[in-house]
């Protein structure tokens, strides 16, 4: 799918479903965009980008790094519904503290399903909520 059309469709989806991201949208020269939303706790942000005609969603950790992310491929217009459903799942799981940011005992940040966190000895978790 062409980059500008892809980004337009994802922005329309975000406007309808997650308008809190809209004020941070930054359009790029290649037709892609990125945006973010700071957590209620203030410790981290969710970020979304549409580089290379795919959705990338991730977490920016408290140090400003955005290495924690995943890619959602959406090559054809027919894939759009499943792609936006997957994007929603990530956003909702992060906001509901089902997918959490944590810092391991070595100081490295990562994300994990909250149900698995109890096995992370010496780690600290960060909640979306205050």
Model segments located where?
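Amphipathic alpha-helical segments
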Residues: 2-21
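Short secondary-structure junctions
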Residues: 16-28, 101
